[in-house]
Swiss-Prot record:
Top EC class, one word: hydrolase
Major localization listed first in the record, in broad terms: secreted
High-level lineage: Eukaryota, Fungi, Dikarya, Ascomycota, Pezizomycotina
EC number, as in UniProt: 3.2.1.25
Protein's job: Exoglycosidase that cleaves the single beta-linked mannose residue from the non-reducing end of beta-mannosidic oligosaccharides of various complexity and length. Involved in the degradation of polymeric mannan and galactomannan. Releases the terminal mannose residue from mannotriose and is somewaht less active on other mannooligosaccharides.
Coiled coil: none
Species in which this protein is naturally found: Aspergillus aculeatus
Gene: mndA
Subcellular location(s) per record: Secreted
Name of the protein in its database record: Beta-mannosidase A
Amino acid sequence: MRALPTTATTLLGVLFFPSASRSQYVRDLGTEQWTLSSATLNRTVPAQFPSQVHMDLLREGIIDEPYNDLNDFNLRWIADANWTYTSGKIEGLGEDYESTWLVFDGLDTFASISFCGQFVGATDNQFRQYMFDVSSILKACPEEPTLGIQFGSAPNIVDAIAQDPSSPTWPEGVQITYEYPNRWFMRKEQSDFGWDWGPAFAPAGPWKPGYVVQLKQAAPVYVRNTDLDIYRLGQINYLPPDQTQPWVVNASLDYLGSLPENPSMAIEVKDLQSGEILASRPLTNITVTEGSVTGVTVLEGVDPKLWWPQGLGDQNLYNVTISVTDGGNQSVAEVTKRTGFRTIFLNQRNITDAQLAQGIAPGANWHFEVNGHEFYAKGSNLIPPDCFWTRVTEDTMTRLFDAVVAGNQNMLRVWSSGAYLHDYIYDLADEKGILLCSEFQFSDALYPTDDAFLENVAAEVVYNVRRVNHHPSLALWAGGNEIESLMLLLVEAADPESYPFYVGEYEKMYISLFLPLVYENTRSISYSPSSTTEGYLDIDLSAPVPMAERYSNTTEGEYYGDTDHYNYDASIAFDYGTYPVGRFANEFGFHSMPSLQTWQQALTDPADLTFNSSVVMLRNHHYPAGGLMTDNYHNTVARHGRNDPGRAGLLPDAQHSVRPRGQLQRLVPRDPALPGGPLQVTNPVLPAGQRAARTPARVPVLAARGHLAGALVGGDRVRRPLEGPHYVARDIYKPVIVSPFWNYTTGALDIYVTSDLWTAAAGSVTLTWRDLSGKPIASNGGLPTKPLPFHVGALNSTRLYRMNMKQQPLPRHEDAILALELTATGSLPNTDEEVTFTHEQWFTPAFPKDLDLVNLRVRVEYDAPLGKFAVEATAGVALYTWLEHPEGVVGYFEENSFVVVPGQKKVVGFVVQADETDGEWVHDVTVRSLWDLNEGE
């Protein structure tokens, strides 16, 4: 069930022409006939609304799929042109309405609007809702009106702004250009101008719905936005809420029209599943400001079922109906929003004496607490699922979020920039228990801070904070991506004398402006001025800068904020001394090649399916070109050279493949295999609840951006196969795991057990050395032959065993693999039932390139009665065994990138999300392993 976005009368207005009896009429602009034109195109074509120019041109056959081949370059003429959307005659608008408005939920980006041939207004912010009063224009219009929206070329407009002598400039080398320059002058999706993971199409168009709204005096108002804030009594954004306090419901409606004097407000809270009415009562402290009405109530004696992230409990949801009435109890407005009761708090407070006594490292916290409970954040970074939002569907996001849940993830960081997510995406996250750490759309740049710019972005922030605040999946607002952790460092290096000035500019917008705007519109959500910080020293809401950031005021041996780490030098990937230590891993990763199936969707010429083809190389945007050049070979070669695991001596080298396509086919599963090591132990740091030791214990982690990142191919990106990191993360995101932590520089190998349960767990781990033919190694290589018992505390890790591989009595490290098999008992969060947990890990004491791999004779067969796939290796241990499904089916394997030992059959299921083969795809599933990197084709 979806939340009703507006009142029932508003919805009826979309379906019927106005009549004398109806006091409000709303017409969806998507029902009109639209055309698209441009002097560059020299023709007019049919269009849709909402839409974007590229999508209308694609539908009409003017261009082919933008993601194909090098269309990133070939279609730049679209971004360089101005485009006009023109409606047909809008018939049937009423003449007896006092006011007529145009309401646009999203115009991308620089638009000039005309109605009945008259200029109405202009827009310059993709992320704002715009309203224009066209009452006088309509009354003077001699015929049925038409609506025109002209979109200017964003690249040309920001270039002109940059050339204006009054525009700000920054020290040389600070601002980061990916393809189109000057993106910091526009309030538009920053990745539209290119990023290191995707193309630069710079789309334009009416990307969200629009309406004609007609109102009568002293009649129901049109609700254009709603802020529903649910929190504990006394809750403050930056302090942990008292879970014993009753719930507070604060409801605010933004409207068009005129409210009667002394309006009343009330709410009804209904259980979505049972239909039971939990509460029905009036709101108090009614305040009316320009265009908004707000009221509040305390739900004394009301005990709703809590909403929990997936894996921690149920996703209990409620419909809250907010009504506004006049003195005669006549309805003025009514809105229903689906929501949940939960508290979510980002704890950045100093480590307490009690925590120190538990062995927690000193410094400051950086972790989330839901309903008063600390928990491990397990997830990914979410970048735009498509460069063109108008073709992202609910089905698209459902499949993506189903994969998130199947991957044992409970949180996504909504990376900026990106765009603010549509409401239906938050709805899906509410249903599936996925927390969404959201950010304001500022990324990897310094931005203007003049009054006009700040006024523009303030309206953007307020609108979006209020719009999504009712969603229980909303976990955080951050000011932007890497502003503090990267941009301030760059400006300090480029111009040390000006550094204090730019710190002041940063604080002016992200702290002094944004923090109060967040706190004024929500009591339930925490705020951080940047995605990655060292946390704050103090908060004083009466100070000019209300949050005093820590910056570099750190003490050695203490740990503070979250980390953001990229190092593409594969030769030091397992030197864990190179990794940062913090409380939370916010973003990290290792670039990898997509699957061959993905490449086949994007490349129309099979001859381009080679590792070093110009198309493959130029589609790799890391390192970015830094401009509009179309020959970025130097940077792409530099990236491949540094983080190619084969060249770094980690994996077998597939460069010798006889046939170019075979070379590519062997390279593409290789990179996803590598994170099977680093992903488990990247960012070995200490969250609250862990001991003060440098361990691989599970950090609250938003994992490598590559998990869900990248609008690389296909309009429906999630139709492509899931890559290796998703499956590796799924495995290590299980509730209780065993991890080998090997520092190859010292030889130390530590075996840890990590639990994200809220109570202690106990069990045992069996360690077994085998050679690569699968046979046990004599005397178990010096390890105990009996299972090793363990007891691990809540949200904690315990070191089970320590050895030094340089002293371990193994015949040959190149012919050895260690199996780690865990069995444990414990209780899942919010349950008392005892559950048995199992987990399996593997470790090789030599890099895969140096292993004595044998011809495994690995095979896969479909077991029809079971509906699953059986994988066997008859001649040797199959490392990083990889199942791949053919085209024509969409879904994911329940496991992948696993180890198969001779004599042990691996049975793997597959979740089908869409099937165009009538089930025949099961006969074309293929299997490969690390051995295949040694083989030519």
